[in-house]
Swiss-Prot record:
Transmembrane segments: none annotated. NCBIfam families: PRK00136.1. This is Small ribosomal subunit protein uS8. It comes from the Bacteria. The gene is rpsH. GO terms for cellular component: ribonucleoprotein complex; ribosome. GO terms for molecular function: rRNA binding; structural constituent of ribosome. One of the primary rRNA binding proteins, it binds directly to 16S rRNA central domain where it helps coordinate assembly of the platform of the 30S subunit.
């Protein structure tokens, strides 16, 4: 099955798993997904993730979700830049998500990073998603 938005698919799987109170969720692996998960792990939105390679050349990522007192750590996770409508911002116009309580994940020339890192490095890029 071909997906038009693999990153959006991963975010939807995470959102649905949190809604069903699952402890983990799996998704096909890609470099972009792995880099986004690195940011989510560093910011404390997921517990961990691991990649499994199969004999047929494909690989899968198992994401361990994080809860605090039984409630999901992630309240809202949404794709911003979509295949039909890309959203680019300069370093000065990176939005503050939920008045600074959430993060935006950007794809920049210096790699995939959280919004506060992009502001520190004075680099703009494509807003991939927002997490609160």
């Amino acid at each position: 099955m071909s997906l038009s938005d693999p990153l959006g698919d991963m975010l939807t799987r995470i959102r649905n798993a949190y809604g069903r109170k699952k402890s983990s969720v799996s998704t096909p692996a890609s470099r972009l997904r792995t880099r986004v998960l690195d940011v989510l792990k560093a910011e404390g939105y997921i517990r961990d993730y691991s990649q499994t390679d199969f004999d047929n050349g494909k690989s899968e990522i198992e994401i361990e979700l994080k809860y605090f007192d039984g409630a999901p750590v992630v309240r809202e996770i949404a794709r911003v830049s979509k295949p039909g409508r890309r959203v680019y911002v300069s370093a000065k116009s990176i939005p503050h998500v939920a008045n600074g309580l959430g993060i935006a994940i950007l794809s920049t020339p210096k790699g995939v990073m959280a919004d506060h890192e992009a502001r520190e490095q004075n680099v703009g890029g494509e807003i991939l998603c927002q997490i609160f």
